[in-house]
């Protein structure tokens, strides 16, 4: 697909009517068609990317940079106006589909041409606004059809590290995400018994990967070996697989959203564990755990060598984590309820503001816990505190929300014990604000204390807020009708009532 001229575009100027853009494209196609091939080809800065608009069944319409820019502008305006498609299609894929829809519209535009009156030549007929408006309608209909055909329903599978196999933790769900041990996932989703048998042979070391690779290249019988190879290369060394059904999404967008939602589900699980253990929950695509060699030489020439290895997944006394996970299912069900509302809302637009903020805050907490730098962890914890409380940067509102959720009623806090308001102050005002605004040094500073306070504050807030928000989503019928401020007042009232009844 040819690129637009960014510096020649109008940027944030008022949108050009779609009919005018279509007229520009049609006129430019006519202009380019009249050029000698060599002259048209020379217009492209990259000979491998010609200035052209492609058609579904092959072929293309030559254009100049003017036509390319008009097609890009029409595509961008369509992208901005179609929020539902923005949720289900990757932007780059959308642009390609839009160019294809323009090409198909040009190919079939003859049916839209006005009749030529008797005694007149075709060249004398003026194509008016009605003609271009009809082409825009055709383009939009074709775009929707192409988008639908490119957006199948699939189950997305993302390998994870959670619990060691000796813990015997059974499969479980966090809302729309199912977590299955590797063996159970293979039995559930690899439908071909011969493919499963090949995988089992490799895992039992009865067959090595080199032999399986060789079998996959055999013309007639290699298909099943090739499928087994695909599965094994995807699963690699992971012991769990997260599965989520993605309905009506283009493939790139489908994978991206699935990865985000699975990541949130893993972060929700991590809230029930200490930060050192939660960091070891990971999924394919996350690179925060690593092994490194450390090498130095002294001034007199001696070699100093060390290494560091961070292992994924957690274990313990055999079976202990199975019991713990059974005890945490109530919280995970509440988190799953919110996550399901997030996924549902994001199919065609936005989720409820309370749900969006909860999801964003959970992501920030997960990033803070994985972060190697105290500096960035404190910033992330501060962002999470702001987002979860709906304070919009107002520290007093943040403190009020946190105290409503966590401050004991009528109890005197012993001297020297960290209070909720001090925790918010240290994480947000003294931490996130000063770091983000450059008021204090960050990267190589010792920020272990504010990081530890953030680690204490945010999981405690999620522990209280998550079940209350889930209950509101399930039982408060008017929640969707409330604006954000009223919804937060209702949430705070429910948090206060919960604390009073505890």
What residue ranges belong to the model's regions?
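Juxtamembrane/membrane-water interface recognition
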Residues: 25, 44-46, 55-58, 178, ...
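Active-site-adjacent bridging/hinge elements
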Residues: 352-361, 402, 429-439
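Flexible secondary-structure boundary motifs
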Residues: 380-418
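Charged, non-catalytic interaction/linker regions at domain boundaries
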Residues: 104-376, 383, 456-502
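Polyanionic, low-complexity intrinsically disordered segments
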Residues: 2-155, 413-431, 438-502
């Amino acid at each position: 697909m040819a690129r637009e001229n960014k510096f020649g575009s109008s940027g944030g100027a008022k949108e050009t009517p779609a009919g005018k853009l279509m007229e520009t494209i049609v006129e430019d196609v006519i202009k380019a068609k009249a050029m000698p091939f060599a002259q048209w080809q020379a217009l492209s800065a990259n000979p491998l990317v010609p200035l052209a608009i492609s058609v579904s069944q092959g072929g293309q319409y030559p254009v100049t940079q003017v036509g390319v820019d008009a097609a890009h502008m029409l595509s961008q305006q369509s992208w901005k106006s179609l929020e539902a498609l923005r949720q289900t299609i990757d932007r780059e894929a959308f642009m390609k589909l839009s160019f294809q829809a323009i090409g198909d519209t040009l190919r079939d535009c003859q049916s839209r041409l006005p009749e030529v009156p008797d005694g007149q030549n075709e060249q004398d007929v003026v194509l008016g606004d009605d003609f271009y408006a009809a082409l825009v309608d055709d383009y939009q209909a074709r775009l929707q059809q192409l988008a639908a055909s490119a957006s199948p329903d699939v189950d997305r599978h993302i390998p994870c590290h959670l619990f060691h196999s000796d813990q015997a933790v059974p499969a479980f769900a966090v809302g729309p995400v199912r977590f299955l041990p590797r063996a159970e996932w293979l039995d559930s989703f690899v439908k071909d018994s011969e493919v499963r048998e090949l995988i089992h042979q490799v895992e039992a070391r009865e067959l090595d990967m080199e032999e399986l690779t060789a079998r996959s290249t055999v013309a007639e019988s290699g298909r099943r070996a090739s499928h087994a190879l695909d599965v094994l290369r995807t699963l690699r060394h992971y012991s769990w697989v997260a599965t989520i059904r993605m309905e009506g999404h283009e493939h790139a967008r489908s994978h991206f959203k699935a990865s985000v939602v699975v990541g949130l589900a893993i972060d929700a699980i991590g809230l029930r564990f200490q930060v050192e253990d939660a960091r070891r929950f990971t999924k394919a695509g996350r690179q925060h755990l690593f092994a490194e060699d450390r090498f130095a030489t002294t001034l007199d020439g001696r070699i100093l060598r060390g290494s560091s290895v961070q292992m994924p997944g957690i274990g313990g006394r055999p079976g202990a984590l199975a019991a713990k996970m059974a005890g945490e299912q109530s919280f995970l069900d509440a988190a799953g309820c919110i996550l399901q509302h997030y996924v549902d809302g994001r199919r065609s637009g936005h989720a409820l503001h309370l749900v969006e903020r909860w999801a964003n805050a959970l992501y920030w907490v997960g990033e803070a816990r994985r972060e190697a730098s105290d500096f960035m962890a404190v910033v992330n914890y501060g962002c999470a505190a702001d987002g979860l409380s709906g304070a919009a940067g107002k520290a007093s509102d943040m403190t009020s929300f946190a105290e409503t959720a966590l401050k004991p009623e009528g109890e005197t806090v012993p001297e020297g014990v960290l209070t909720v308001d001090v925790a918010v102050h240290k994480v947000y005002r003294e931490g996130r604000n000063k770091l983000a605004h450059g008021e204090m040094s960050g990267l190589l500073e010792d920020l272990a204390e504010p990081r530890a306070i953030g680690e204490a504050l945010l999981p405690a807030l999620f522990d209280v807020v998550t079940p209350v928000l889930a209950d509101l989503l399930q039982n408060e019928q008017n929640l969707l009708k409330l604006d954000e401020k009223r919804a937060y007042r209702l949430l705070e009232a429910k948090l206060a009532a919960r604390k009073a009844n505890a």
